[in-house]
């Protein structure tokens, strides 16, 4: 896996307009609706997250809910008010 990821990383680095995002999800949403409300507690679990893009540095201490706002910032798209995460970009 490491060797294959290295090859993917090298291919992305060779492109000037490509971003590589690597993460894992060990949160879960087995019960989305328990009491009629969305259960988002799983979005606070820590997960690995790496961004390979020139000029982008991530802060530490993020959570799963911060990944989508980070991707939106990279894409220069405004974060919806419903999202409670914050971008990991310093």
Could you describe each region identified by the protein language model?
Residues 1-90:
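Feature captures the catalytic ectodomains and active-site-proximal regions of enzymes
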């Amino acid at each position: 896996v490491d060797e294959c990821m290295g090859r993917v990383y090298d291919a992305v680095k060779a492109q000037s307009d490509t971003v590589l995002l690597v993460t894992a999800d060990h949160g879960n949403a087995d019960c989305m609706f328990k009491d009629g409300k969305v259960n988002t507690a799983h979005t606070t679990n820590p997960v690995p997250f790496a961004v390979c893009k020139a000029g982008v540095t991530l802060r530490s201490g993020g959570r799963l809910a911060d990944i989508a706002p980070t991707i939106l910032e990279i894409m220069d798209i405004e974060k919806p008010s419903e999202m409670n995460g914050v971008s990991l970009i310093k």
